[in-house]
Every structure is written in structure tokens, then in C-alpha cells.
Amino acid sequence: MQSTEPWSPSWGTLSWDYSGSGSLDQVELCPAWNLPYGHAIIPALYLAAFAVGLPGNAFVVWLLSRQRGPRRLVDTFVLHLAAADLGFVLTLPLWAAAEARGGLWPFGDGLCKVSSFALAVTRCAGALLLAGMSVDRYLAVGRPLSARPLRSARCVRAVCGAAWAAAFLAGLPALLYRGLQPSLDGVGSQCAEEPWEALQGVGLLLLLLTFALPLAVTLICYWRVSRRLPRVGRARSNSLRIIFTVESVFVGCWLPFGVLRSLFHLARLQALPLPCSLLLALRWGLTVTTCLAFVNSSANPVIYLLLDRSFRARARFGLCARAGRQVRRISSASSLSRDDSSVFRGRSPKVNSASATW
């Protein structure tokens, strides 16, 4: 995963970007003007996402990791997903500072590599974990009996471990081939990948394997489960809708970026010849969609807070001095299946079972 791309108003300036920078052939010959006011708007968006995502995801991790007794299956997925989002948002101040300086990276080569690697790993892990959670929800609703052997705590931990392992492998190119690259105008250095054409093919392949494929799995499971929503109970239906909201927001935030990123890879490989006007529009589109994708890292806690009364109750208790005793008194109310319940579902003195959707 790479940084967003702040393009210089000068001609032929080496660009760096989350969406794949460095100038090659046709792309190098086209002007790369900055998105108007991007140096002010983009850092503000990143810092806002950091301000929301850091405490929000940290609270979700704290809330789920301190649970006593057996952890429910979906709890494990959401815990790992929150951890991935937390790792993602921790890098946002660095990219915000670089964006504010017109794309010049002030933190040295080491932090450039580590931050790029962290973005790649956490983005990939998030996509794979959501795909795994989608499959689990489909099995819970569509195959509750036949899939019971697969829906065990051990299997879910193995799936999460495999997702992280795949994500770390997918992030290695960012660790190995990204670093400080001098801008062509000699003003400073930018955090960019090395301008090798072969890296574009690798990037496109990784995008297909770590984004397009998990996205397809998520959408198929979403469609299959949605067909069964009218036949499930109210509590299960509400729980599934919260999960679907999380997945839909992820798709809405990342799909535009994935499409434009693929087009940009193809353009840099000269497989998709584009005039300079369309290349500039593509670059600006990547800037906007990258911001949208980055903001997704702070979205899930907001979704839980808005849609789940039980989570709001637990959040209130968690912020109180007596949170420990009160949270331990929260009991399960309803479940998505007989052996699995949703993430923040519970009963508090002010939350009835109908509203405890997770």
C-alpha cells in the first residue's frame, strides 16, 4: 500500500502516491498539476480520520480483548478488523504532514518504508478479514448445521492468522521497493516506489489477489445472506444489517480507488494509452478516492455507535470509573445462530434485548 499522490504543478515532476507513483514513459511526459487546495484539504481529512479512528478502534480492541470466557466467533473477526484499522490510522499523521508539504517526505527513509508497509499490510488484512467474516455469516445463516465443524473458534483463529500472514506477504514489495526518491526538480525527497515497470505488474497482481478477490467473495456472501433476511428473526436481521453496513461502507470507500488504481497501473504499463487530459483526471480521481479509502479506517466505530444501542451502552460503561463491574454484568440477549452471537450484543440496565443487535 502506498501513499496518496500530491502532484507538483511543474511538468515532469516525480510523483509519489498511495496509488502508485513515480513517472514512466507516457505518464512522465504529461503535466502533473496539484489538485486545487489539496495541500490543505487532504491533511485535514487525514487528521480528522486519525482523531476519530484512533480512540474508536482502540476502544473496540480494548472492549473485545478484555472479554472473559469463550469469545464468540464474530468477536474474533471484529477484534482483528479493529486492530487492522488501528494500525492503519496510526500512520495517517505522517502522510498528512507529507501532504501539507506538497508531497515532500520529512521523516527519513526508514519511516517511509515502515509506513508504506503498515498501510499495505493493514489494508490487505482488512479486506481479507471482511471476506472471512462474510463467509462466516453466510455459513451461520445459510448452512447452520452442515458448516458447524468449520465454525469453531480454532478455525476462525486460523482464518484470521492466515489473513495476517497473507497481508504481511503482500506488504513486502512496499517494504523492499519503497523509499526516499529525489524529486525531479531537486527540491527534496518523496516517499515513493522505485520507478520500475515490473513493479506495476506486481502491484496490479496484488490488487487483484488482495482486493478484487476478497471483494468478490464479500459481495457474493452479502447477496446470498440478503436473500435470507426476510426469513430470519428480528434480532438476527438487525445484527446482519450492521455487518452489511460495515461491509458496504468498506466497498463504497475502497471500490472507486481499486478501479482507478487498476487503470493507472495499466496506463503505466502502456496497456491503456490515455491522453494527458485523462491521465490528469485519473490522477486527481486517485487523490480523491485515496482520501475516501483512508477515511474508511475510522468508519467502523462510528457505525457501531450509530446503529447499535448495546455498543453505545457498553461505551458509556467503558468510559466510567466503574466500567469493569457494569460491563461484566452485561449478558447475552440474542444471537445470529445458536452457537454464535454478534459483536457488541448484550443487555445493560437501559438496553433491552430487541435493541441489542450485536
Swiss-Prot record:
Side of membrane Cytoplasmic, spans: 65-76, 135-155, 222-239, 308-358
Membrane-spanning intervals of the chain: 44-64, 77-97, 114-134, 156-176, 201-221, 240-260, 285-307
Record keywords, A-Z: Disulfide bond, G-protein coupled receptor, Membrane, Receptor, Transducer, Transmembrane, Transmembrane helix
Extracellular compartment segments: 1-43, 98-113, 177-200, 261-284
SUPFAM superfamilies assigned: Family A G protein-coupled receptor-like (SSF81321)
Top-rank taxon: Eukaryota
Keyword Membrane tagged: yes
Protein's membrane topology: Multi-pass membrane protein
Cellular component terms (Gene Ontology): membrane
Disulfide bonds: 112-191
Residue segments, region Disordered: 339-358
Gene Ontology MF annotations: G protein-coupled receptor activity
Subcellular location: Membrane
Annotated InterPro entries: CCR1-9-like, GPCR_Rhodpsn, GPCR_Rhodpsn_7TM
Family under the similarity heading: Belongs to the G-protein coupled receptor 1 family.
Role summary: Orphan receptor.
Protein name as annotated: Probable G-protein coupled receptor 25
